[in-house]
């Protein structure tokens, strides 16, 4: 198999004959997910720079200790760093990629809501300064609709 601007590549012939099934809902990926563990490939395929910042001093982190990229419609459109405290999902940092599109803030907010539900939390809290005004407004909108609370 040849791909323009790539070195040698291999693909399972069966995988090339079946149409890919997109994941129906946006999903946060953990930093060790097979899709993103090889950073140069992620940069090449998604134009997404992912750095695992857990070993950096807190003052040098850009996105957070254990940041999770957000996969939506086959693109990495944002990222968030989460913590769990006293029955709440705390968003310590949330941001969108420049190419994310006009609905990305709402998608990120709904994805935070889904994650909170999956892990059994009934509250979402937003750390002070964790997100820009667009993302913060989207989180407030989603949380109000679902009776979850966002605390600045």
Which residues fall in each region the model found?
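Long, charged, low-complexity, helical-prone intrinsically disordered regions
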Residues: 1-152
């Amino acid at each position: 198999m040849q791909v323009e601007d790539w070195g040698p590549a291999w693909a399972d012939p069966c995988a090339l004959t079946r149409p890919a099934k997109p994941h129906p809902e946006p999903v946060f990926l953990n930093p060790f997910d097979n899709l993103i563990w090889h950073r140069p490939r992620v940069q090449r395929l998604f134009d997404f720079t992912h750095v695992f910042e857990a070993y950096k001093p807190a003052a040098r982190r850009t996105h957070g200790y254990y940041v999770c990229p957000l996969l939506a419609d086959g693109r990495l459109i944002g990222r968030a760093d989460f913590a769990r405290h006293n029955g709440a999902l705390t968003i310590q940092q949330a941001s969108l990629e420049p190419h994310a599109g006009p609905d990305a803030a709402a998608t990120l907010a709904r994805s935070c809501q889904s994650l909170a539900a999956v892990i059994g939390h009934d509250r979402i809290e937003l750390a002070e300064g964790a997100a820009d005004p667009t993302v913060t407004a989207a989180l407030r909108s989603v949380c109000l609709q679902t009776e979850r609370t966002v605390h600045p």
